[in-house]
Amino acid sequence: MKIILRKEVSSLGLQGEVVTVKDGYARNFLIPNGLAIRATEGAIKAIETEKKQRAFKIEKERKAARELADSIERISLSVCVKAGESGKLFGTVTPQMIADGLKTKGFDVDRKQITIEEPIKALGKYEVSIKLYTDVVATLKLEVEGEAVEG
């Protein structure tokens, strides 16, 4: 019997694939458990349409992420942090600080998307990676400046 997989089945294939299995396996296990549907012409056309829509949506999201990455790479972000006279920071620069700084410039980036290779504990210029999509990573130029500390 030909079936269309609704979910990934390790021994058969990925979601949306049309595969041939024994009738009993399809009727008694795959179809009742919602893992597959019968491969009729209408179902195959519906799956193809769904695949095209999903591919279009993914490409649209990827394009938007690339545009956002280009915009982020064109700017430089300054973060003011309390620091001692030697230039060492009291604490570190966190992804949340960077996300808040980007938000003030009009970029909506979640702190979980920001990757800081090594903790930023001194004043200076750094580069920070921001993962905007599975294969789109922006590099942000970050300048850490010190605030005057009274003491």
UniProtKB/Swiss-Prot annotation:
Cross-referenced InterPro entries: Ribosomal_bL9, Ribosomal_bL9/RNase_H1_N, Ribosomal_bL9_bac/chp, Ribosomal_bL9_C, Ribosomal_bL9_C_sf, Ribosomal_bL9_N, Ribosomal_bL9_N_sf
Record key words, sorted: Ribonucleoprotein, Ribosomal protein, RNA-binding, rRNA-binding
Entry's Gene Ontology molecular function annotations: rRNA binding; structural constituent of ribosome
GO cellular component: ribonucleoprotein complex; ribosome
Signal peptide: none
Biological-process GO terms, alphabetical: translation
Protein's job: Binds to the 23S rRNA.
Stated family: Belongs to the bacterial ribosomal protein bL9 family.
Name of protein: Large ribosomal subunit protein bL9
Organism of this sequence: Chloroherpeton thalassium (strain ATCC 35110 / GB-78)
Taxonomy of the source species: Bacteria, Pseudomonadati, Chlorobiota, Chlorobiia, Chlorobiales
